[in-house]
From Swiss-Prot:
It is found in: Cytoplasm. Pathway: Lipid metabolism; fatty acid biosynthesis. This is Acyl carrier protein. Carrier of the growing fatty acid chain in fatty acid biosynthesis. The gene is acpP. Belongs to the acyl carrier protein (ACP) family. GO terms for molecular function: acyl binding; acyl carrier activity. It holds the Pfam family PP-binding. PROSITE patterns: CARRIER, PHOSPHOPANTETHEINE.
């Protein structure tokens, strides 16, 4: 799952998977803008069949946040 999340981020942002670390912040470290973040959230929802409400999406700042959130939602 973690690798798939990184692949989605790399595809959406046009960056190398090697640049993506759990502590990487989407905006500060990976160069995402607010639209990129919205598109990433939608891609995660589709890929992992989870719903991420806006109030939760606002709290997701790093790659690790996404990994933990989806694992929690999927009961892993």
């Amino acid at each position: 799952m973690e690798e798939r999340i990184k692949e989605i981020i790399a595809d959406q942002l046009g960056i190398d998977v090697e640049q993506i670390k759990p502590e990487s912040k989407f905006v500060d470290d990976l160069g995402a803008d607010s639209l990129d973040v919205v598109e990433l959230i939608m891609a995660f929802e589709e890929e992992f069949d989870v719903e991420i409400p806006d109030e939760d999406a606002e709290k997701i700042q790093t790659v690790g946040d996404v990994i933990n959130y989806i694992k929690e939602k999927k009961g892993e």
